[in-house]
């Protein structure tokens, strides 16, 4: 029996690595969604950061599923600082300002996954994690940015929890895969139920 084909509507290397390491056979494609325009529209309608992650994941999955067979996974993650959506930094100066803004605070990461088939969503999940950033020194921050460089611009919080970025935190509550941007366990259950993984 052949497995249901799976497409990941994402170019995120972190999400691709998570699925690959979990043993999921998939093909990754760019979703071709203008995320900035979509976010701006959703923010204008006072949509919460949690629901923005869900809406963007759905847009990606649905768009790609109109062109690809089988199951299409769309995913998105937002950073929620006291109800305010925080976007990825565009430069190292912005990354420094972002990390200073997060210093000594607690924020949430909302990670959404939507699976679509034939242009319509058929499954979704949004999971959240709470992360408390320690009151690190300016000197530590400068060294961290110097060592990590442009890699910080790929993460919404300007940290890579799977590497040295874990040192930014004094408390983390939530699932590791949710923090990395792909709530995995529920997704794997769904893929098994729909013939994309062997049981």
From Swiss-Prot:
GO terms for cellular component: cytoplasm. It is an enzyme of class 3 (hydrolase). It catalyses: a ribonucleoside 5'-triphosphate + H2O = a ribonucleoside 5'-phosphate + diphosphate + H(+); a 2'-deoxyribonucleoside 5'-triphosphate + H2O = a 2'-deoxyribonucleoside 5'-phosphate + diphosphate + H(+). GO terms for molecular function: nucleoside triphosphate diphosphatase activity. Its EC number is 3.6.1.9. The keyword Lipoprotein does not apply. The keyword Ribosomal protein does not apply. Keywords: Cytoplasm, Hydrolase, Nucleotide metabolism. InterPro entries: ITPase-like_fam, Maf-like. It comes from the Bacteria. Its cofactor is a divalent metal cation. Disulfide bonds: none annotated. GO terms for biological process: nucleotide metabolic process. Belongs to the Maf family. Nucleoside triphosphate pyrophosphatase. May have a dual role in cell division arrest and in preventing the incorporation of modified nucleotides into cellular nucleic acids. This is Nucleoside triphosphate pyrophosphatase. It comes from Caulobacter vibrioides (strain ATCC 19089 / CIP 103742 / CB 15) (Caulobacter crescentus).
